[in-house]
Amino acid sequence: MKKSLCVVLGAALVCAACSEKEEPAGNDPVVRSVQVASSALEILPGGSAVLPFTVEDKEASFLEVKLLLDGGQEPEEFSLREIVRGVERGSYQAVIQDAGLGRNYDRDDVHIAILPRSPSTGNDYYVQSSAFRVFSEANPPGTVYTGLPVVYVDTQGGQGIYSKEEYVKASLKIRGTEQYDGLDEVACDIRGRGNTTWYWPKKPYLIKLDEKQSLFGMPKHKRWILLANFMDRTLMRNLVSMKVASMMSHLAWTPGCVPVELVLNGKHMGSYLLIEQVRVDKKRVTVTEMTPQDNVGDAVTGGYLLELDFHYDNEVQWTDPNGHNNQWGNGIPFGVKYPDPEDLTPQQLAYIKGYISETANTLYGNDFKDPDKGYAQYIDVDSFIDYWIVFEVMGNHELGNPGSVYMHKDRGGKLVAGPCWDFDWGVLSYNTSPQARTGLVNGNAIWYGRLRQDPAFEARLKARFNELLPKLETIPDYMDECEKRLTESARLNFAMWNPAEDASQNGGYIINGDENMSFHDAVARLKSIYKERLRVIPAKL
């Protein structure tokens, strides 16, 4: 591409450099030397700069102009965009363009090289200028250029963030892109978050803005999450999973997300995913907001947001004896995420525990298949089908652990599956889910083993998968888009962080299986496993 551009420019210069009455080719003056007007040229990130130069024989014509380094190769970080003829004969301006790679560079061995128009010699040779310097400080302290938006967080007094419970006062601003708007500085609080992920070197964070803001076109809210994706060599497991979940029309809401760079207290921390927090809100999980007075009748029936998580770290939690989990066998751990623990009344807790118990007892009872007396009177079946498909297509075994699994119930309504969350641990990996090569990952997860014993449920599940398949088959193209979008971010991120350190939290074994691969090889593997899932799943339904 670079070479062909130079040839076109050179062809234009042949006409520009020749006299009006062209001499025979054999009599053309020959370029014998090239002089540059400056020994140093600074280019701003993403910009260009002009370097004037002259040729000794002002009537000389030439075929090609390019930039060459001492080794004879063309530079990667910048290129020759165009040549503009000067006012005087034999004078020109070279427009040199930054390649947009986001790198610092400082080359002092750059030459303008001209291929003369001299058919009398059978060999191509370039006449080169003396060496000159081209430099750019793409990443001065506290800045980064990868093509992604940059989130800047500065804590009060430069304090460190060491707790998942205690907030630190801070300010936040965003440098946008052509696609995404930026944000002027606003006040916020920030703390750590996550279970296992909090104990890795690259930390995830929760941000609480003082005032609701719309970030990157997502609905206004105060609370936002910065996922570190530390162990994900592809940097796209969560991104792709949320894309798949957004295709599911029976899931009420899927968190919006945008990959960003994080600069914390002036230090670039790497590639992050800014994502909406799973939280009850008119623009997120839209169940009825409760008060401590909602204790009887229809008022006590909702809304609730529940998390199923074997880590058992919710403040209000219990285990229902029915169902299957991958950690200890029987029983499902439930936690109440909404109402907040300080607002949840004993009557409300008794109601939702009773509803879960009645649902599970019916599901595991003799009449569970009955369309009127069975499980269908308690759960929104379509949402449970779509939720399972997302986990199964992505090979996410967390549904069966269970971990970061959500359900919600609105006032007067049934139990609804979702939203989807936290798809970085073992997703699309044969390391954590070897059964994915030939079978289902979540065939027996939580309540699904029992649900699939109902032929009507299994038929609906199969029909829904086949209906969604054309959409699901577009995801590899989306992965290609993400790969292009994240390439430079990945280069900088993995110069700072080693995802193979995730083995420290997994008995010495890497989790996803691609931690020691290159970014591009890891993406190719992710895409290959995804395509295999689309082939394997239909045969097992």
Where are these regions (language model features)?
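Proline-enriched interdomain boundary motifs that mark the N-terminal boundary
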Residues: 28-37
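Short, solvent-exposed loop/linker segments at the N-terminal edge
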Residues: 41-47
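Extracellular acidic, Ser/Thr/Pro-rich low-complexity tracts
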Residues: 55-59
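Aromatic sugar-binding surface patches on proteins
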Residues: 86-97
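Internal "kinase-insert"/substrate-recognition segments embedded within catalytic cores
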Residues: 208-214, 221, 228-230, 250-255, ...
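C-terminal motif of bacterial Sec signal peptides marking the signal peptidase cleavage site
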Residues: 14-17
